[in-house]
Swiss-Prot record:
Record's protein name: D-aminoacyl-tRNA deacylase
Motif (Gly-cisPro motif, important for rejection of L-amino acids): 141-142
Native species: Neisseria meningitidis serogroup B (strain ATCC BAA-335 / MC58)
CDD domains xref list: Dtyr_deacylase
Subunit structure of this chain's protein: Homodimer.
Annotated PANTHER family: D-AMINOACYL-TRNA DEACYLASE 1, D-TYROSYL-TRNA TYR DEACYLASE
A GO CC term attached to the entry: cytoplasm
Amino acid sequence: MRAVIQKTVGAKVDVVSEAGTETCGKIDGGFVVLLGVTHSDTEKDARYIADKIAHLRVFEDEAGKLNLSLKDVGGAVLLVSQFTLYADAASGRRPSFSQAAPAEQAQQLYLRTAELLRGHGIHVETGRFRTHMQVSLCNDGPVTILLDSFMTRISPKMKVVPD
């Protein structure tokens, strides 16, 4: 599971259709998280990503150090599904998305990640799965962090959330 986490002072996601544009998620401050799911992802990956999002210390404390977490500052998450995080553009000019999980599996783990974040006491807004969306945000910092739960399988230094 991959997550691109962007610290924001405000963000929204609109669903675009023939009927028009509808805002389906909006936050005043916290993280915009673009979330991609691959074939081998499980509940364990969702727990790892949700725990990291809740506890990453990238908000400034009184001394100006990045020492506070999303939970510490009462921030929210705008969670947006993003299968293109598993694009392979190594050869040719058209990326392959074969590493992205099938829609049913991806949606289940996407919703589970949102549920786990809520379990941490975090307010979560979401995009709408399998729709064309427009994400608007104002980056803060900017701070952008890439998480990949696969790294927990190959690096002994990576901390894995217990079962």
